[in-house]
Every structure is written in C-alpha cells, then in structure tokens.
Amino acid sequence: MPAVRTKSGHGVEYTDEAITATYSYNTTRVEKEANGDVTVQPIQLHLKFRTQRKVQRTGVMLIGWGGNNGTTVTAALMAHKHRXSWRTKTGTKQPDYLGSITQSSTMSVGLTSEMEEVFVPMKALVPMINPAELVIGGWDCSGMNIADAMRRAQVLDVTLQDALYNYLKDMHPLPAAFDLDFVAENQLSRADNIMQTKNKWESVEQLRADIRNFREKNSLEEVIVLWTANTERFSEHITGVHDTADHLIDAIRRNENEIAPSVLYATAAIMEGCSYVNGAPQNTLCAGLIELARRHGVFVVGDDFKSGQTKVKSGLVEFFMDAGIKPECIASYNHLGNNDGYNLAAPKQFRSKEVTKGGVLDDMVSSNSILYPPGSRGPDHCIVIKYLPYVGDSKRALDEYNFSIFMGGEQTVVLHNTCQDSLLAAPLIIDLVVLTELMHRVTVTQCDGEDCCDKKEKMTSYTHMETVLSLLSYLLKAPRVPEGTPVVNGLNRQGQAIKNVLRALVGLPPDNNMQLECRLPFLRGVGS
C-alpha cells in the first residue's frame, strides 16, 4: 500500500507517537427571518487534531455471534488471517474485503502539477487496524460452535466452509442474556445457551465479567461490543426508567420489565469502558444509556446496518432530489429466508425494522421546500418484509419509485435487487469496528486564533468526538446523532463526512470538488 503523508511545514507534524494537524474549519451560521429571508454568516474555527499512530490491540464481542452475520464475518477474517483460498466453478478465489469502505474504497487527495487527480486507499491516510488482526468473541442464544453455525447459515461456498472449519470449530459463544418478550416466539427453539442468572442486574454483572475475561485472556487494549443478533421489539421508553443514567441503573437493579436484553449488553459494555454499536433497528440507545456512555468516555453508535435496499434508496432519492425531480411514491418489498427474516415475521419485530427503513427519506424531504412546500406531505412510502425459507440468505428487494418531472410528466423506476444479506452486512461490521477503534485514538482541541496552535498555554484540553458517533452514519439505516443536531440520511453526504474528517486528521482541506485549478488557467501552476 502506498504511503501518504502531508508535506512538512503545512501545519502537520508526524512523530512516532502521533499525527498532529492544525486545521481551519470553515462553516456558517444562518439566521432565518420571519419573512423567509436568510442571512448567512461565514465562520472560521481553528482546530488541532491529534491522532495516535499506534493501533490498539482490539477485540470485538459480537452479540449474536452464531448467527449469519457473526459467522460470516468471523469466517472471512479467518480466511484473511490464514490466507485461505477456495475453488469455485469459475476458478480459484482469494479472500477480499469487497463492500468495506475502509479496506476497498479510495479517496482523492488532489491534483498533480500535470492536472492528474490522485486517489489513494482510504486506509492509507491514517493508521487503521488490520481487520485480520481483530480478536473475535461474543455471545449467542444458540450454543453451536462457530464452525457448525457457519454451515447452518449456508452463506459461504461449501469449499470455503470446509477450508475454514478447523479454524472455527473450537470457537464457542458465551451464554446469552435472553428475554422472549423482546424477540419472536419462533426463536425459542434455538435458544439452548441462555445465561443462568436470577435477575437483570445479575446478567449485567455476568456480561461485565465476560468482557473482562475476554480482554484479559487475549491481552487486549480495546474491546468493542457490537449487536448483530435478532431484532428486538421497540421498548417503551419510560420516564424514571430510561431517561437518565442513574434511573437506568436503578431500573435494571429492580428488574424493570421494559429493560431489553440489548440494554443489558450496552450497559455492561459501557461500564467496562467499551464502545457499543447497535447493528439492529431496536431503540436500545435511550437517553440514559447515552448519558452513561458520556460518563464513561466511550462511544455509542446506531442504529441498524445499512447494507442493501436502504443504501440504494438513500443514494437514489438523494440523486433525484438533487436533480430537482420530485419523489411521489415509493413501494419497497423484501423477502428472505434466513433467521433474521424468520424473526421479522413477528409483527412487533417487523415494526422495529419498518421504523428504521421508513425514516430514510425524512431529512431529504424536509430539505427541499420547493418540491415539498411547508404543510405538504412527503412521498407515499410503504415497506413489506416476508419470510420465504427457500431463498435463505439470498434476499430479494423489489422497489418501485414514482416521480413527478417537468411540465406534469411522470417517471417510474423499478429495481430488482438480489443479494446475499450477510455478505453485505459483514463488511459493514468490519468498517464500524475499524472506524470506531480509530476514533478512540483521535482527539481535538480548539485554538484561540490562527497562530495559537503553537502556543500550548492558550489551548483547551484535547477531547474526543461527541459520545454519539454520528460520523459513522453512512453505515447505518437510522443514524443516531447527538441531541439537537440534524439527522443526515443522504448517502453521498454521509460518505463525504467520513472522507473529509480523515483529510482533516492530516491537515488537508475538505474535498469540495470545486477544482478551480481546472477552470481558471492562471491557477494551473500553483504549487508546482
């Protein structure tokens, strides 16, 4: 992989310990008048980013380790670690990271003096963990070892399964915290590995012990806990239960009914100093949990992996609306036959998924008062998910988009997407872990003025990003954001946020695509 380094003397310092970058953040503040007029004030803030270069020895504990996603990502990482290969009818295959933005995407770093645009791997800009070096563990309500669970999932080619079987057969999930009130009753048949605790607080204590043992056994510096288990029903967030950290802890101690298993895992993770990622639709990340995470100085990330239909939708609707074309009606239909689909066949669990898939349009609709004037409704939008066992992990997504176009015209776009659900989700798990680990190593401070960044006495203390790590919204269907800040669902905007923050870490300006060097002849020689 090529080395990428910002030229010295441009506000960036590379040491063995850290990359320190002075950065001018140009933004705006807007005032809206009662008559609709808008006044925009440009603002420049002077920041200093510090990125620790030493990647932490990191483990990830997967909740739902024995499911399709958990076994697929574990098997894939073992294939990379042991450099496995496997034969298919089209030839011999090697392990890859297709679908991972950190491992398989590139980003522009600018133009050469000959006006050639240069792209580099995203992972080349700052030190990122090698996914094959992650230590994997976790919990599952099924006690089947990971090798047999991989075979049960029926996702990977049989020859690859056979090649990896011996690497996985001694991996066993820990007993899970399980409450049938929060998942479909049809999940009871595979629940043979349940934690034998008397109450919810005892479950939290056991989960904390599991995390400590995992960390100590594997000599880990960081542990990230990630939910990739079945979708829970929505919890009713109750004042006095979910609203503050202290209320939440007290509610768990008194065994409150409306505390879901996912909240127990998140609480245990946070209290053990681990960031928590919610890869499912349920509303785990209540106000009390976020306050608890802030208190312990860790991140929470959510909600729900954005892997297939919703990723396409968030990109396509953004594209059409940016073109001034009005979405009027969107009908989305899915069928799949894996255990995720089996669980979602229950109405309460489907409702959780419907909410996260349905909210993807909200901010884009509200952003365009020309297409959707105040008081008008957004596009008609419905979502259907059906369980058909025959198709297994090969999910079908069918979408019909209806648009209004120029002078009363109409346009219809129909998509049929066949994809293996877990092969799209597994790379997202990798990215969520890689980027969360990176953000553990990034701190930032604000300077008093443009020249103050060399004057340590005038700098406030370095701090991490906000507890709710909204930077990772690109990877999630229903991105959680800090309270009082806007939700962004547009796929391109989400992706650009990640890339531009990475650029900031090495002192580069945001990639705004102006490319004035190409449009103003007198700028062609600048920087030569």
Curated annotation (Swiss-Prot):
Tell me what reaction this enzyme catalyses: D-glucose 6-phosphate = 1D-myo-inositol 3-phosphate
Q: Does the keyword Lipid biosynthesis apply?
A: yes
Tell me the enzyme class.
Answer: isomerase
Gene3D superfamilies reported in the protein's UniProt record: Dihydrodipicolinate Reductase, domain 2 (3.30.360.10), NAD(P)-binding Rossmann-like Domain (3.40.50.720)
Q: Which GO molecular function annotation, any one, does this entry have?
A: inositol-3-phosphate synthase activity
Q: What is its main location?
A: cytoplasm
Phenotype when inactivated? Inviable in the bloodstream form; viability is not restored by addition of extracellular myo-inositol. Levels of glycosylphosphatidylinositol (GPI) glycolipids are decreased.
Residues annotated as binding NAD(+) are 66-69, 140, 187, 190, 228-231, 279, 304, 307, 338-340, 353, 392-393, 421-422
- Its domain of life reads Eukaryota
Q: Where found?
A: Cytoplasm, Cytosol
Q: Give a Gene Ontology cellular component term annotated to this protein.
A: cytosol
GO process terms (BP): GPI anchor biosynthetic process; inositol biosynthetic process
Give the UniProt keywords, A-Z. Cytoplasm, Inositol biosynthesis, Isomerase, Lipid biosynthesis, Lipid metabolism, NAD, Phospholipid biosynthesis, Phospholipid metabolism
Which cofactors, if any, are listed as required?
NAD(+)
Q: In which pathway does it act?
A: Polyol metabolism; myo-inositol biosynthesis; myo-inositol from D-glucose 6-phosphate: step 1/2
The EC number(s) attached to this protein equal 5.5.1.4
Known activity regulation?
Answer: Activated by ammonium ions.
Q: Which Pfam families does the UniProt entry name for this protein? A: Inos-1-P_synth, NAD_binding_5
Q: What does this protein do?
A: Key enzyme in myo-inositol biosynthesis pathway that catalyzes the conversion of glucose 6-phosphate to 1-myo-inositol 1-phosphate in a NAD-dependent manner. Rate-limiting enzyme in the synthesis of all inositol-containing compounds. De novo-synthesized myo-inositol is essential for incorporation into GPI (glycosylphosphatidylinositol) glycolipids in the bloodstream form.
Q: What protein family is recorded? A: Belongs to the myo-inositol 1-phosphate synthase family.
Q: What is this protein called?
A: Inositol-3-phosphate synthase
Lineage of the organism = Eukaryota, Discoba, Euglenozoa, Kinetoplastea, Metakinetoplastina
- What is this protein's gene name? INO1
